[in-house]
């Protein structure tokens, strides 16, 4: 029988993992809210941010590397939108989805070519990895920092969307793309800002994830990306609060499943079983709005 401290550590671990999924899931849900596009390359942007840090930190201090990594991640996200999605804006959705999958494989194979398929050690960030004693529990500082930083970023994002001009434009475009164009809203600027925000949050998630995990490989973005996608669908894709809540639920459940040796092997399967159940029982997710097709 485990004591209370064991379950508290599991809960903290689940909240931390859920926070990382939330940061990635917001990128999925924002892009879908604006473009009705599932950006399947989003998990690979997260992976590329990890490699940016590996190579930049080899010649720069962490104080320089972290801002540079975030900047390069944002530029990568915007470049993908301009090169792979913008030319297909009026194309059938299937064409855009195939393009997104193609970009995902392109990034994976590019990383594989550069690294030779070998995992690279992530630079140590002592501020994150230092072990703290909190209430008799020995936990890494990153376990506390991750959920706090995630909540702070989500609050800032909600304020930006609700209170600023670009945020109001985003809400207008997500409601009615065609009418927003007719009303003079700069659609390209709104879409670019959406990719800037999503890629920035993926970059932050990458730093927090790999600082704790310790190494980066070309395929490592696939599973966190897919789990974040499930979180976005669970909460209601297009809903930022829904994506965050869905991510926390998945992270906590995953943590408790992994702690049970009998069913630990099914931790990944649980996430995708949950996706099937959601699609069967509540296709719009917990907080998603029912969309109507215009004819």
Set out the residue ranges of the language-model regions:
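Membrane-interfacial amphipathic/re-entrant helices at transmembrane-helix boundaries
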Residues: 1-23, 52, 63-64, 91-98, ...
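Helix-loop-helix "hairpin" substructures at the membrane interface of multi-pass membrane proteins
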Residues: 17, 137-216, 240-245
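Transmembrane helix-bundle core of multi-pass membrane transporters
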Residues: 87-163, 190-193, 256, 262-269, ...
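Membrane-embedded helix boundary and interhelical linker motif in transport proteins
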Residues: 12, 34-79, 83, 259-260
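Alpha-helical transmembrane segments within multi-pass membrane transporters and channels
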Residues: 60-103, 110, 245-250, 282
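Short, non-helical or kinked segments that cap or interrupt transmembrane helices
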Residues: 19, 28-50, 90-95, 166-169, ...
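Cytosolic-side transmembrane-helix boundaries in multi-pass membrane proteins
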Residues: 6, 175-182, 186-189, 261-295
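Transmembrane alpha-helical segments in multi-pass inner-membrane proteins
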Residues: 21-25, 61-71, 195-202, 206, ...
């Amino acid at each position: 029988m485990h004591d209370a401290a064991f379950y508290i550590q599991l809960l903290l671990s689940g909240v931390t993992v859920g926070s990382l999924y939330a940061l990635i899931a917001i990128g999925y849900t924002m892009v879908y809210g604006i473009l009705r596009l599932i950006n399947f390359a989003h998990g690979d942007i997260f992976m590329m941010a990890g490699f940016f840090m590996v190579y930049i930190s080899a010649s720069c201090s962490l104080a320089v590397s972290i801002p540079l990594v975030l900047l390069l991640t944002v530029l990568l996200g915007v470049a993908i939108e301009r090169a792979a999605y913008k030319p297909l804006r009026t194309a059938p959705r299937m064409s855009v989805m195939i393009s997104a999958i193609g970009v995902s494989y392109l990034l994976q194979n590019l990383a594989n070519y550069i690294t030779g398929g070998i995992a690279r050690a992530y630079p140590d960030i002592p501020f994150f990895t230092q072990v703290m004693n909190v209430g008799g529990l020995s936990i890494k500082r990153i376990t506390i920092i991750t959920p706090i930083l995630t909540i702070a970023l989500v609050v800032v994002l909600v304020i930006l969307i609700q209170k600023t001009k670009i945020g109001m434009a985003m809400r207008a475009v997500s409601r009615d793309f065609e009418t927003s164009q007719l009303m003079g809203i700069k659609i390209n600027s709104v879409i670019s800002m959406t990719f800037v925000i999503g890629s920035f949050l993926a970059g932050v998630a990458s730093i927090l994830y790999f600082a704790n995990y310790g190494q980066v490989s070309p395929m490592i973005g696939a599973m966190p990306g897919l789990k974040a996608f499930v979180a976005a669908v669970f909460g209601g894709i297009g809903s930022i609060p829904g994506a965050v809540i869905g991510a926390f639920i998945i992270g906590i459940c995953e943590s408790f499943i992994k702690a049970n040796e009998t069913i630990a092997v099914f931790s990944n399967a649980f996430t995708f079983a949950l996706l099937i159940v959601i699609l069967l029982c509540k296709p719009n997710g917990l907080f998603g709005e029912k969309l109507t097709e215009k004819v």
